[in-house]
């Protein structure tokens, strides 16, 4: 029984850590996206990026 409880504890810790990592990653992505949106809203994209994307 001890082995099972230890194993279950380990699994729960692993799942919990994965969830926390995913949550942090999601928050970082949202933060970056909001910052990017703010930047693009404040200033128009430079001409060279448009021309380079068109040439490719």
Curated annotation (Swiss-Prot):
Membrane topology of this protein: Single-pass membrane protein
Signals that turn on the gene: Expressed in the early phase of the viral replicative cycle.
Name of this chain's protein: Uncharacterized membrane protein pNG6
GO cellular component, one term: membrane
Gene: pNG6
Primary localization class, coarse: membrane
Domain of life: Viruses
Bilayer-spanning residue ranges: 12-32
Species of provenance: African swine fever virus (strain Badajoz 1971 Vero-adapted) (Ba71V)
Keywords: Early protein, Membrane, Transmembrane, Transmembrane helix
Subcellular location: Membrane
């Amino acid at each position: 029984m001890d082995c099972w409880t230890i194993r279950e504890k380990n699994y729960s810790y692993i799942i919990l850590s994965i969830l926390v990592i995913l949550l942090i990653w999601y928050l970082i992505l949202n933060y970056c996206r909001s910052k990017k949106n703010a930047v693009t809203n404040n200033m128009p994209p430079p001409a060279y990026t448009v021309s380079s994307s068109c040439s490719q």
